[in-house]
Amino acid sequence: MVWAPLGPPRTDCLTLLHTPSKDSPKMSLEWLVAWSWSLDGLRDCIATGIQSVRDCDTTAVITVACLLVLFVWYCYHVGREQPRPYVSVNSLMQAADANGLQNGYVYCQSPECVRCTHNEGLNQKLYHNLQEYAKRYSWSGMGRIHKGIREQGRYLNSRPSIQKPEVFFLPDLPTTPYFSRDAQKHDVEVLERNFQTILCEFETLYKAFSNCSLPQGWKMNSTPSGEWFTFYLVNQGVCVPRNCRKCPRTYRLLGSLRTCIGNNVFGNACISVLSPGTVITEHYGPTNIRIRCHLGLKTPNGCELVVGGEPQCWAEGRCLLFDDSFLHAAFHEGSAEDGPRVVFMVDLWHPNVAAAERQALDFIFAPGR
């Protein structure tokens, strides 16, 4: 089909308007004929298009139409500036704010705690961080994270009470209270091979304890009974230089772990000490993207970890892996003569979080972001 102009050339129009002559009636007639020819061509084009659609197979037309509708729907949901309205982490914990309870149990009041701090507009902030990451890098592989942030309130509200991460839930991850050693075999073997190294550095640190004061670098955590101390090398993704200098070999060891979380707020590495008679009440961790690893350093009788209702005991020189987004608690019911229960705790990536997702989560949950 040959394209036809919808009107006479511009010069003819100008001549017709501004240069009256005896040929004006003839030019007007030519102009009308040209328009008539153009409309005939347009009508023929439309008729041809309609006939082409009629000649197509009805099933094929319906299929193409459905695919087009699905594509438009997908673009709408992916391209929205803001996620659907949902309950923020802050509002999930608002009811507990007045009396210091979390899921019916005491929680810490530390302003630095990513799990217990009430962060206004957290979900919107996470979505903004994800969009910023995608602009810099790619949306490829971000489906689960995008889904998790968009539907966070629904996920957290609909989770069974046995597993309810307080900050971020990544959907479609296999769930189990305890993991086998093979889940992160390399890192487990590295830690267990260096058991004596870590134990020696702990014993040097522990000599500074006295009945009258808490040694520098140690933190005392809130418990209903007993005493729970922690000595952080990495605290919520941030290295603690003063403490690392006191445990140089243990700190260097962290660098040899392949799956250690060290660049986002869900990553920690510390020595955890429970004195006899201590009870850590049931609580949930902040996320399901990590595995918490405990390497037993000193494990007297009467000590127990309960995750998702399943009890386990620590063993010296052995790693115990669990998902702390499950409801969990710890006890030291031994006597004063038994001494403290001591573990080296480090957070590892859940084995089913892909490499691209790990990079994005490090960006989204970077300390201070």
UniProtKB/Swiss-Prot annotation:
GO terms for molecular function: dioxygenase activity; metal ion binding. Residues 80-369 are lumenal. The chain crosses the membrane at residues 59-79. Its cofactor is Fe cation. Its EC number is 1.14.11.-. It is found in: Membrane. This is Aspartate beta-hydroxylase domain-containing protein 2.
